[in-house]
From Swiss-Prot:
Cited SUPFAM superfamilies: BPTI-like
Region (Disordered): 84-106
Protein name: Guianensin
Alphabetized UniProt keyword annotations: Blood coagulation cascade inhibiting toxin, Disulfide bond, Hemostasis impairing toxin, Protease inhibitor, Secreted, Serine protease inhibitor, Signal, Toxin
Bias-annotated ranges (Basic residues): 84-93
Binding partners and assembly: Monomer. Interacts with mouse, bovine and human coagulation factor X (F10) (activated). Interacts with human coagulation factor XI (F11) (activated). Interacts with human coagulation factor IX (F9) (activated). Interacts with host plasmin (PLG). Interacts with host kallikrein.
Signal sequence extent: 1-19
Amino acid sequence: MKIALICSVFLVCLAYTWADEDVCSLPMNDGLCRALHKRYYYDSATKTCKMFYYGGCAGNANNFETKRACAEKCYKNKALIKTRKRKPKKKKNNKESSEMTIINMD
């Protein structure tokens, strides 16, 4: 009984993982309703996340609330760096501080 339960859970997780990977290849579908929710979908032709207006019902799983969520799910082997423009902080000796970010792609 325990083995059957463990196997069932494993198969559900495996199926979810396989289905999850196909989300990014689905076409954009704005749904049947007429709401205007700003969403993002992954365009597999251009390999970018693009904005669209979701109607609020139906549609498909290629529908993300943020561009970052879309990118995290669908960009393969790419670094996602979001930067903000800030005024540089000055140290006491009036030298501007600088920051460096290193991203490991492996």
